[in-house]
A protein has these predicted regions:
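Long, intrinsically disordered, charge-dense linkers/tails
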Residues: 1-124
């Protein structure tokens, strides 16, 4: 369910969202599709070719990560769908940063502020 929600939220930003068989601690990571150029080569091409578009990557989700497990629990309540999708978008942004890529800073900052506001409103 969480994988489907993340895939819907990300739309065409990634080639695929799939379960990771290799991650043990991280919640997610971005990997290149088989046969595609390395991320480093794509970054170099993008710097030298203004209209170069990065190839879509695969977002691998670790189903055993505590955040992903909690998202799966929350998914049983449809009222949580928006929150789960926002978490999926943030996981993708986190994975982009870990891969040395730049996510949309304005969207990420707004999302993080919303998360912080939700947490702050739960404090006494």
């Amino acid at each position: 369910m969480v994988l489907q929600d993340d895939a819907l939220a990300l739309g065409d930003q990634v080639q695929e969202v799939r379960r990771s068989e290799r991650l043990t601690e991280s919640a997610c990571c971005l990997v290149n599709a088989q046969g595609s150029m390395s991320t480093t080569l794509q970054r170099v091409l993008r710097m030298n070719t203004p209209d170069f578009e990065m190839q879509k990557m695969i977002l691998e989700i670790n189903p055993n990560a505590s955040l992903v497990r909690r998202m799966a629990e929350l998914a049983s309540n449809p009222d949580n769908n928006r929150f789960i999708q926002e978490c999926g978008l943030q996981l993708h942004a986190n994975a982009m940063i870990m891969a040395g890529l730049a996510p949309n800073g304005n969207e990420m900052a707004a999302r993080l502020q919303d998360f912080m506001l939700q947490l702050a409103s739960q404090k006494a």
